[in-house]
């Protein structure tokens, strides 16, 4: 009889062995840090193609985006609760943006957001 080879079935999981380093210890898998860095960079290149950004400035911009995101998410969540709704829609987000951002900045943000939602729905 021919020896049978073990074939991994679909959905089965294998134990992954850690790779060893030169010193003989096990290599640790580094946890990935999520960031808006690539998107900030893409927007920068659209606005100012010949301008760069330092890593420290990128950290500050990433922190800024996270802060604004949390403020908008929190405010839109509150608005949904006030209106006894369990889902945050684009309407709650738009109202939250109007409440959080001042004057002209809110108008521009709302128009850009509306444009992005329209582009997304037409592409489907």
Swiss-Prot record:
UniProt keywords, alphabetically: Chromosome, DNA-binding, Glycoprotein, Isopeptide bond, Nucleosome core, Nucleus, Ubl conjugation
Main location: nucleus
Molecular function as annotated in GO: DNA binding; protein heterodimerization activity; structural constituent of chromatin
GO cellular component, one term: nucleus
Post-translational modification note: Monoubiquitination of Lys-119 gives a specific tag for epigenetic transcriptional activation and is also prerequisite for histone H3 'Lys-4' and 'Lys-79' methylation. GlcNAcylation at Ser-111 promotes monoubiquitination of Lys-119. It fluctuates in response to extracellular glucose, and associates with transcribed genes.
Residues listed as glycosylation sites in the UniProt record: 111
Subcellular location: Nucleus; Chromosome
Cross-link (Glycyl lysine isopeptide (Lys-Gly) (interchain with G-Cter in ubiquitin)): 119
InterPro entries according to UniProt: Histone-fold, Histone_H2A/H2B/H3, Histone_H2B, HISTONE_H2B_site
Region (Disordered) residue spans: 1-31
Function: Core component of nucleosome. Nucleosomes wrap and compact DNA into chromatin, limiting DNA accessibility to the cellular machineries which require DNA as a template. Histones thereby play a central role in transcription regulation, DNA repair, DNA replication and chromosomal stability. DNA accessibility is regulated via a complex set of post-translational modifications of histones, also called histone code, and nucleosome remodeling.
Subunit structure: The nucleosome is a histone octamer containing two molecules each of H2A, H2B, H3 and H4 assembled in one H3-H4 heterotetramer and two H2A-H2B heterodimers. The octamer wraps approximately 147 bp of DNA.
Family membership noted in the UniProt record: Belongs to the histone H2B family.
Name of the protein this chain belongs to: Histone H2B, embryonic
Organism, scientific name: Strongylocentrotus purpuratus (Purple sea urchin)
